[in-house]
Amino acid sequence: DRSGLVAEYAGQTATKTNKLCDAAVGGVLFIDEAYSLIDDSGDDPYGREAIQCLLKRMEDDRENLAVILAGYSLEMEKMIRTNPGLHSRISSTIEFDDYLPADLGLIFENMCEQNQYQLPATARYRALLGFDELYRLRDRYFGNGRLVRNAFEDSVRRLADRVANVSRLTESLLTSLTEEDIAIPGLSDQQLDNLIQQPHELRIQCRGCERSVRL
């Protein structure tokens, strides 16, 4: 992001940007929220210096350095339009679709598994309904994987709060996320409770099966 390329004082940005490019030669330089390099006011000499330095390195090291600029679509388009040099040096543009609710649920399950937390069916169902609702209400700033990470971290904190006063702790208590632990950023517990009370149609696809079943 911007902090990795732009320095605090005049004359230091080029050095900082070049150092980052040097470290990435032979590989990939990934810059997230790349549009933050350009101030909306247009009066940002440090950001312009970073971009000019980056453009030069993209040209000079084009055989040994791949640069990926990432961010929200509209902001990225605006950034590219305001700098002809960027437009001419970007060889391809890829726009990723938002994760589907099932994908978000699977990411959540994988995070639980990787961190050795158990996720019972009731807790999994509550999380999936929450992701489905937020997907339905999503705008262009939809969090995708970041949303899931925040949900996982919030749920783990709830688990810790729930067992804080338990006198006899077991491994199962410390590592089992229950339905009441599930927290989905942007939805209250009452909203999640209401979702659970509503009828839902789910499509079940088992691994290795050729058919799916609707419930």
Regions found by a protein language model. Give the residues of each.
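Short glycine-rich substrate-engagement loop in P-loop NTPases that contacts/grips substrate
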Residues: 1-24
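Conserved C-terminal "switch" segment of AAA+ ATPases
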Residues: 78-81, 96-141, 160-167
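Conserved P-loop NTPase "ATPase switch" module shared by AAA+ and STAND
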Residues: 1-2, 24-46
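Short cysteine-rich clusters marking metal-coordination/redox-active sites
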Residues: 204-209
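Short metal-coordination and nucleic-acid-contact micro-motifs, chiefly zinc-binding Cys/His arrays
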Residues: 199-202
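Canonical AAA+ ATPase core
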Residues: 35-42, 51-97, 114-115
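Cys/His-rich microdomains that often coordinate metals
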Residues: 213
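Conserved C-terminal helix/linker of AAA+ ATPases
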Residues: 73, 122-128, 145-146, 152-153, ...
